[in-house]
Structures are given as C-alpha cells and as structure tokens.
Amino acid sequence: MPKPQSKRSSLPNYIKSRGELIASLQALLANDHVDLEILRSGVPWPSATEIVQLSQVSESNEDAPVAACHSSNEPVVVDPALGDDSHQAHIDLDVNWLSNLIPYNGDELSEQPDSSLFCSPPERMSVSDSSNNTDYLSHFSSSSICQWDNLLDSIGSQTFQDTINVLSPHCQDSGVSQPSNLADDTLGQGQPVSTVVQPQHPGSTERDESVSSIASSQESPRKRQRPHYAIEKRYRAGLQERFEALRDCVASLKKTQHEQRLPGTNEDLAEGDDGGSVSDRATVGRMNKAEVLNQATLCIRQLQEENEVVMEYIKLLIKQFRVMKQAMQQALKVDINS
C-alpha cells in the first residue's frame, strides 16, 4: 500500500503567523500601559486587537475617580416621633372584656358568663398613665382557668357537629355518592365488591397483529452502516499523513543544523540510539518512526529553552524602549515651553 504524501504547503500559514507576531510587537511598542507579563513562554502571543483593548482598559482604570469612603461616625437621622413618649395610648379595659370576645349562642349556656368566673372581684384590669404592668395572667384564678378550658372544649365540639350537619344535606341533594360510605355499607351487608371487566372481542387480537405488521412494513429501512475496516483504513490514512508531515519537518530541521555546523566538531560524531552518528543518519535517507519521534522531542525541548531566553530579552528591550520614549517626550515638552 503506497503511503500518502502530504501535499499541503506550510508557507502561507508561516507568513500569516509571522505577520501576526510583527503586528503584536508593534502594538506592544505603541501602547505603554500594557503590562509585559502577558508575554510568557509556552503561551501564544496576544493579538494586536487584544493588546489595544488591554491598553484601553488600563487607561480607563487610571482615569477613573476614587470612590469616596463614608465614615461610620456620620450621624444617623432618626424620626423624633419614634422616641417621643408624649403620644402613648391610654387603654381602659372593662371587667367583662373576656366574655365579650366570645360570641357563644349555645343551648347549654344561654346567658353570658358572669365576670366572677373569669376575674377575681377585688381585682380590676385597667391600665393607667403611671402603670406599665402588662402581666395579665395574675388576674386569673385556677377555677376560672378550668372553666375557660371546659367552655372552649364545648364550643369546639359543637362547631364540628354543626359543620357536619350543614354539609350532609348538600351531599344528599346533589346526589353525589361518597365512596367510603358505599364501601362500608357493602362490606357491612356482606356483599362482595366486584370489579367490572370489559369483554374482549374474538377478532381484536388478530386485528392488532395485522396493524402492527403493516406499521413495521411501512418503516424505512435501516441505514447501511460503514464497515469497521473502512473506518480503520480512513483513520490510519489520516494518521500516516500527519506523521509524514512531521517526518519532513524533522528532516529539514536536521539538514539545516547539519549545514550550519562547523567541520571537525564533536557534534558530528554524536551517536544516536542505534549506534550510528547523526550525520551518517542524515545522509542515509528516511528515518523510521522511533527516530522521528525522538528527534521531534529533542527539537521541541530546544525550542522551549530558546523561547524562554528570547522572551526575557524582548521584555527587557521593550522596557528600555519605553524609558527612552518617555525621556524624549519630556525633552520635547521642555523645548516647546522654552
């Protein structure tokens, strides 16, 4: 099986990336407010538009006024009516105030209960201007409390019975049958409760089977799935294409390094994993996959180290350029003023 060769040229992409780097560097030189820490090794350079946006944000932050801090010692405005005691309410309670709150109309107690049942005779429940006592529980005796509880129990039982008597005629008039009562009556009479089962027609089963068969026949046929070997073949072809591109890149890089070396150095005699020298392997021809991956790893590490050094030098040069730029601007201002 012939190996597919990569016919895509990387020259347009290289020119595009080079132009983007130049534009980013020019934007850094033009905008002095951008922090240089955005340049880090191993991280793609920010685009020119991103650098301009960062510069605008930093300038707006510098021009923004500082928010005034309010101290906690400022006087707090308080409504004088809240602290004024001249408008206090005067409450005078009647002796029979508790009995008046209970609208009782039963047959057992036709008359209103005497005030002596609830409150002791010598004590009066009143609030004067000079009295601030709010504890009203001391005005009740033990006998009055017991009678009060009995009264509440009788009222609650009678109210519940009246509610049942009022609702029962409505249920009888509307003709709504209560399921629980019907079930109790049926079980009490000894009659078994039976459930109604709908009869099935003899031809219903055959009719259902015929309908299901027609529906299954009308379904669209399944899409033909691609066999596994075709998917595997396509995957291997794409992987081989990318590996060939990596092989070409490593070979061209090795060739460039071999041409730049000086003759008679120890680098030409360096041995690889298989015992052969690098120069001999470069002149022989194609490399196997292990050699390609090994050389690619070495190239990546070397590029990372060089990138770190170059990034530090770029930051230093940009800082020096900004200092010189500020000095020139100050000198121009002095000349103009003079």
UniProtKB/Swiss-Prot annotation:
<feature type="region of interest" description="Disordered">
    <location>
        <begin position="256"/>
        <end position="277"/>
    </location>
</feature>
<comment type="function">
    <text>Transcription factor that specifically regulates the expression of the gene cluster that mediates the biosynthesis of gramillins A and B, bicyclic lipopeptides that induce cell death in maize leaves but not in wheat leaves.</text>
</comment>
<feature type="region of interest" description="Helix-loop-helix motif">
    <location>
        <begin position="237"/>
        <end position="303"/>
    </location>
</feature>
<dbReference type="InterPro" id="IPR011598">
    <property type="entry name" value="bHLH_dom"/>
</dbReference>
<feature type="domain" description="bHLH">
    <location>
        <begin position="223"/>
        <end position="303"/>
    </location>
</feature>
<dbReference type="InterPro" id="IPR036638">
    <property type="entry name" value="HLH_DNA-bd_sf"/>
</dbReference>
<feature type="compositionally biased region" description="Polar residues">
    <location>
        <begin position="174"/>
        <end position="203"/>
    </location>
</feature>
<feature type="region of interest" description="Disordered">
    <location>
        <begin position="171"/>
        <end position="230"/>
    </location>
</feature>
<dbReference type="GO" id="GO:0003677">
    <property type="term" value="F:DNA binding"/>
</dbReference>
<dbReference type="GO" id="GO:0005634">
    <property type="term" value="C:nucleus"/>
</dbReference>
<keyword id="KW-0539">Nucleus</keyword>
<feature type="region of interest" description="Basic motif">
    <location>
        <begin position="223"/>
        <end position="236"/>
    </location>
</feature>
<keyword id="KW-0238">DNA-binding</keyword>
<protein>
    <recommendedName>
        <fullName>Transcription factor GRA2</fullName>
    </recommendedName>
</protein>
<dbReference type="InterPro" id="IPR052099">
    <property type="entry name" value="Regulatory_TF_Diverse"/>
</dbReference>
<dbReference type="GO" id="GO:0046983">
    <property type="term" value="F:protein dimerization activity"/>
</dbReference>
<dbReference type="Pfam" id="PF00010">
    <property type="entry name" value="HLH"/>
</dbReference>
<keyword id="KW-0804">Transcription</keyword>
<keyword id="KW-0805">Transcription regulation</keyword>
